[in-house]
Amino acid sequence: MKILVDENMPYARDLFSRLGEVTAVPGRPIPVAQLADADALMVRSVTKVNESLLAGKPIKFVGTATAGTDHVDEAWLKQAGIGFSAAPGCNAIAVVEYVFSSLLMLAERDGFSLHDRTVGIVGVGNVGRRLQARLEALGIKTLLCDPPRVDRGDEGDFRSLDELVQHADILTFHTPLFKDGPYKTLHLADEKLIRSLKPGAILINACRGAVVDNTALLTCLNEGQKLSVVLDVWEGEPELNVELLTKVDIGTPHIAGYTLEGKARGTTQVFEAYSKFIGHEQHVALDTLLPAPEFGRITLHGPLDQPTLKRLVHLVYDVRRDDAPLRKVAGIPGEFDKLRKNYLERREWSSLYVICDDASAASLLCKLGFNAVHHPAR
């Protein structure tokens, strides 16, 4: 049994070798010749999986180690009788922590408290729901927009997108990319929406590049609209609008979900799905794969305020480490993908063991996803 895996899927060689012969290949572009005798293909979001790639090939199963699936033609796979699995929620925590790292940086730079801001979350799935929970744990007001969930009758205080635009100081997008249909998200943030944002608002896109109309956004910024922008995703990736990059406050190369934990979850989820598909079901404990974190434990004295939280968050991950390299190589062919391929190891907040002498600080840090314990000062 021959299994092709994206060369940038961590732990893929070791795990899938339990099931067959493993060959690691680049994801963009996939070497088509390798598909001629392969039984399974494991990809990431950079690989377009459709009829033109797989027609006439012996592939029986496709797995994507990503939460999003807009790069996969699921309808064609089903029609062709090819098994499929994604990894829903695998990188949700990573994306939430990317958003926090960005917001805390902007708050420090511009001198505002997040408690004084209302955050509008567009798309309340694995990422949006976790983001809501962590923001509300800090006492930050959130507004939610998710029309598909409203139509399904899901519980929640959902608002219209117009309401979020009118009332939110921060608008962050966490939707799939739907190019048509009743829940179309292509250019959901169009020129009209962008112009309608509150003066001084923050716009964040960490889902799919085309959810925000990049041309319209650049037009508004060039005209002097007072707006802070965080973009992790771009229309036309791996190409991007270099002029737009110069105008945004934070620009990164589609790495919001790139924690070691998130990548490992993606790999293990598709591994488990494929093992079940071939009748040799196996389960993997994530902590058996992950290395020891860089920082073993730290001690926090006193209560948790925003500056302290910012220092803790940036101790684990400071978004600026990914902004500067992209600006340095933007526009050079191949460099966008190279930044992703050679991405420095990044951990999640749970990797940081925090000993607190303040019980409320320990409790709050646990709600935020840190590994925190309370030890009273002696």
UniProtKB/Swiss-Prot annotation:
GO terms for cellular component: cytosol. Its EC number is 1.1.1.290. Gene3D superfamilies: 3.30.1370.170, NAD(P)-binding Rossmann-like Domain. Keywords: Cytoplasm, NAD, Oxidoreductase, Pyridoxine biosynthesis. It comes from the Bacteria. It catalyses: 4-phospho-D-erythronate + NAD(+) = (R)-3-hydroxy-2-oxo-4-phosphooxybutanoate + NADH + H(+). Pathway: Cofactor biosynthesis; pyridoxine 5'-phosphate biosynthesis; pyridoxine 5'-phosphate from D-erythrose 4-phosphate: step 2/5. NAD(+) binds at residues 146, 175, 232, 257. GO terms for biological process: 'de novo' pyridoxal 5'-phosphate biosynthetic process; pyridoxine biosynthetic process. Substrate binds at residues 45, 66, 258. One of its GO terms (molecular function) is NAD binding. It is found in: Cytoplasm. NCBIfam families: PRK00257.1 (NF001309), PRK15438.1 (NF011966). Catalyzes the oxidation of erythronate-4-phosphate to 3-hydroxy-2-oxo-4-phosphonooxybutanoate. Belongs to the D-isomer specific 2-hydroxyacid dehydrogenase family. PdxB subfamily. Homodimer. This is Erythronate-4-phosphate dehydrogenase. It comes from Escherichia coli (strain 55989 / EAEC). The gene is pdxB.
